[in-house]
Amino acid sequence: KEYAVIEHDGIRAAMFGLMGESAVDYAPESGLLFKDAKEAAAETVEKIKSEEDVDMIICLSHCGTVEDESDVMEETEDYLIAQEVPEIDLIISGHTHTLLEEAVQVGDTYIVSSGAYNANMGHAVLEPKGDGSGRYMLSSYKLIPLDETVADDAAVKEELVKYRELADEEYFSEYGFS
């Protein structure tokens, strides 16, 4: 399935992932083919809307964004996805290792990014807009440094190590990166 629906405290959220064009370009020999991210996002959101009764739609993006609100921001894949697929409430951005201290708002869509290498955890709180639109607004967003003051979760750490080793063995070593 192209998406998953999770329910928490009576709120149903559909979540789906995207791989961006520039991310795919880093692995041209992988043999993987991806649709255009904007096209894939639009198709997935339409499918969610026709098949599910959800309160919000969240995109886990490996497309990327930039740190400032310059003209370059408007050219990033995540920004363009937010413009072209306005039904998405939240885009959690990755790939470019961007640290967004503040969320970027594009219409009713918010873009957040917590940097790279598990250095931070983003905490975003969405609340109903209360205007009858059924949309959500970002009421708070903060970055939590994952430093020595935050205890490791043994199960998460074990999974992370497992997937890093798998990526090194199965992919990166073939291209001299491990």
Task: Set out the residue ranges of the language-model regions.
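Acidic, metal/ion-coordinating pockets
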Residues: 1-149
